[in-house]
């Protein structure tokens, strides 16, 4: 889908904030569009969020990416364009920057003021969460991807941004390699309880965290989910992902973001474990069969994939590719009753479209449910996340 780009700028005090807007195409200025405001991480800039901006625009959003004042790395080919020095930057100044961007966006005649979403990665995710809490009546949704909720702990340990210093004798300048922070950054966050501050936000939250993140341990994300009301925050833990996704992981992450934006609930998470494969040729057609086992642990069902699960990938000359997985799980439903789920999953026009048949009375609604799925690739086999509009309806 084609998109349009336009430079963005606004003021915070005497500093100019610069970035880029991403528009769906075609775009009608008289129409109202939902808005996604994107927050980059430590030593990043708005260009590091460009892939998110384009994806949101393809979904019909106006996306706004910007450089935090004093953010970014000291030396980089594509420098930060907003004003400010890194030694003056703090978490609070970034929240103020984001607040200024929100105010600017609310003045756009084409912005749907009922649908303003904040999304951020790493330090930008932390900042987005704080800003959502402080402007909770104006923010319709929050997406935090590996948010750096570890920052206060890192300050208390004297290792902010990868630096090493004595937290009892904090230097005026904290050398983080690619950037230099001021002592004020440390002093501000060292006494902060990020989870208490995040909890003030009452809207829908999606929190995505890699299990192999060497900077932000996934325990911070687990604790963050617990700080919100029950059912308010969906936590997605991604296998084999560190402190940034590879291309395939980004695609599956954004597929999950798309389900979140559509208001769909993850009802089943199935860990697939590939056991063996075989290749077949038939009248010029090539077919690969992947056999697998696996297991599911979710609030609705817990069980294992029975022997015989198979993913068939076939390519016929003139007909293109077709992918179809079929398998059966056996286990216990949400009422503790033994049951089976038979799943057929194949690609539709825009999403994976699984069909489930079950003998569970408690899960009988699955037999008629409108379902979609996201495949999240990982070592040994994917995780299949199945979504429904609202469970039980």
Model regions and ranges:
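The serine-hydrolase catalytic nucleophile loop
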Residues: 42-54
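Short beta-strand/loop motif that positions the catalytic acidic residue
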Residues: 201, 207-209, 213
